[in-house]
Amino acid sequence: MEQNKDPQMISKHNSRLPIWVLSPREEQQARKNLKTETYKKCANFVQAMADCAKANGMKVFPTCDKQRDEMKSCLLFYQTDEKYLDGERDKIVLEKINKLEKLCQKQSSTK
């Protein structure tokens, strides 16, 4: 999971908002992470569709309907169920909490 590694991100965090509130950029990152994870989980279906398309060329759509439907079903299963997106959001929130804890420890050790 690729995140913004800017150490100032936590210090710039708006203290009036709870840390679990995601910025639009963080929400976009959660959705991007979900897409990546979904394609990993459905890799066999995606590969089957790609192989069928490669083998059939211009006849891909009538010939590969079964593979397309299986791939679509798998991808939509993960992308439409909110618990998977919530899981990606939780990962980002946990990362923000960890960064904040490290920052607090660093500040307390310098005092």
UniProtKB/Swiss-Prot annotation:
CHCH domain span: 39-82
InterPro entries in alphabetical order: Cyt_c_biogenesis_Cmc1-like
Membrane topology: Peripheral membrane protein
Domain of life: Eukaryota
Annotated Pfam families: Cmc1 (PF08583)
Predominant location: mitochondrion
Disulfide bond positions: 42-74, 52-64
Chain ranges for the short sequence motif Cx9C motif 2 as given in the UniProt record: 64-74
Keywords: Chaperone, Copper, Disulfide bond, Membrane, Metal-binding, Mitochondrion, Mitochondrion inner membrane
Chain location of the short sequence motif Cx9C motif 1 per the record: 42-52
Subcellular localization: Mitochondrion inner membrane
Protein's UniProt keywords contain Zinc: no
GO molecular function: metal ion binding
Role summary: Required for mitochondrial cytochrome c oxidase (COX) assembly and respiration. Binds copper. May be involved in copper trafficking and distribution to mitochondrial COX and SOD1.
Family listed: Belongs to the CMC family.
Name of the molecule in the record: COX assembly mitochondrial protein
Gene that this sequence comes from: CMC1
